[in-house]
Amino acid sequence: MSIIKTIKRHLPVARLRRSSQPANGTYDCRALPDSLASVGLSSRAGGILMTFVPPEADFQRVSQAWQRFNSADLTVLTLSSNGALSSSRSQSTYCDGNGPEGSYLWLPDTLIARHETHIVDLHVADTQTASQRITAIQQELARLQVRMPLSADRTFAMIYCDGLSASEGFLMQAWYNSGRFPCLAIGGSAGGKITFDGTWIGTGGRVLQGKAVIVFCQMAPGKSFAPFKSQNFTPRDQSWLIAEADPVARTVTSVFNRQGQQQSFVAALCEHLNCNEAQLSERLKGLTFGVKVGE
């Protein structure tokens, strides 16, 4: 049974139309909604509707279906993902990453009283170094015409990047360098297949690549917000001091060992994992790399 039928059975549309609480749910990319009512929302819904598209789906087709619901009062964001979450699922909050199941989150205007959306070019194709890209993005941010007043207690920014741009860090560096935005920044990146075929963001009826979308949000009177932080990994004892790296390509070539000598990072990993180079990919399964920053 599709999620649309389930919603209709358990939550009559007449009741749904009166709801002003945030809502989330799942949908089937093989049977896309033909109206907001079919996913339990009023045709007059205002606020922000975020939809997450599973990696195996046709993003263009799915995004186009959801973007039909854009209006003067409702902003629809469509994000490619590598797996979605929804608290509406009975078995698990995790949607099947390899199937047709996507999820959505509606933030009504009773919660987010006012919002505005901006698109920022990440200058992936025309910059070669980290400093060039940061400068170019900072110039883009300087040109944004933000109409709403920003404050740390009443507003925040939701920022979503093209995941394959590898520019999240550059964008945030430019964001803080600009000094223009005295508010919390939250968000993430559009995901996709592990084959890195592409990541996409849909907004305003367009499908974007190489861009970031910033949604400035102002809380409704009597509403407040607080950041929630979590990690999906547990740090291990081993760390290395990086000697050579390319921050644009996100690659590490060499590190310093405990004796202060420079060595190939591949050799350092093989030594630590007690394997040869041919076995390294297998030994790295279940592991990832990160940079620890201050809390």
Identify the role of each PLM range.
Residues S2-G47, V53-F59, A65-F69, L74, ...:
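Small-residue-enriched flexible segments
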